[in-house]
């Protein structure tokens, strides 16, 4: 079978390594095409909302990847749900939102006899509103009674950008330890994936599942394109 070409569209350089590392570990046969426009996150933080001009830029990136022969497109920027939906409508290949697969896995933990309590941690504050809406909509569609708690981890992303990954991980873990009781913790940004082990160690006495987006996304794309997913997992 011909190796699939997966377009990875980023709005921050911090997301590039986590998803490429997951592909190398889980699906090394895939050919990854990375496109980065790091001004998108800057502009969203400045404007406070997703504008028509930003959506058009996403469409332009999508059209480029399709012209380059992409078999699937994965967006790694978690604050641009509406723009990604617009791109999916103009694509003839699978298009995946960054957290869609992780949300599906979290919702699979739901039980009929009680609410599913989910904690969503984010280091990029503008992403919380759109991600919360997306998760709530997915839960509603599945008739799942969801209790969602969100928390922003300020300055953690800046520490990561400055090269202090351990401080970034520690801040996320400290915030996780202060959360109310829940059934699962979700790490919102792709750039948070490397903090998963630190968070799990901080919560080791609770056996609480901690999910990150990159691994879930790779596995979902494998399934969408009909490739074998029975391989070693790093999630």
Task: List the predicted regions and their residue ranges.
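Non-catalytic structural scaffold of enzyme domains
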Residues: 1-235
């Amino acid at each position: 079978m011909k190796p699939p070409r997966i377009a990875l569209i980023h709005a921050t350089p911090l997301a590039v390594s986590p998803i490429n590392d997951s592909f190398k570990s889980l699906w090394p046969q895939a050919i990854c095409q990375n496109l980065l426009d790091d001004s998108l996150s800057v502009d969203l933080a400045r404007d406070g909302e997703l504008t028509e001009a930003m959506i058009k830029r996403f469409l332009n990136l999508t059209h480029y990847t399709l012209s380059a022969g992409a078999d699937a497109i994965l967006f790694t920027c978690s604050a641009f749900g509406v723009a990604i939906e617009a791109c999916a409508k103009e694509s003839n290949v699978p298009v995946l939102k960054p957290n869609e697969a992780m949300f599906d896995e979290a919702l699979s933990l739901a039980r009929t006899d009680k609410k599913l309590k989910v904690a969503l941690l984010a280091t990029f504050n503008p992403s919380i509103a759109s991600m919360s809406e997306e998760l709530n909509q997915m839960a509603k569609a599945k008739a799942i009674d969801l209790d969602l708690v969100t928390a922003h981890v300020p300055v953690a992303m800046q520490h990561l950008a400055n090269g202090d990954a351990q401080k970034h991980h520690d801040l996320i873990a400290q915030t996780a330890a202060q959360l109310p009781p829940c059934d699962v913790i979700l790490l919102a940004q792709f750039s948070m994936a490397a903090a998963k082990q630190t968070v799990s160690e901080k919560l080791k006495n609770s056996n609480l599942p901690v999910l990150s987006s990159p691994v879930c996304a790779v596995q979902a794309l494998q399934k969408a394109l009909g490739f074998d997913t029975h391989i070693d997992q790093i999630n």
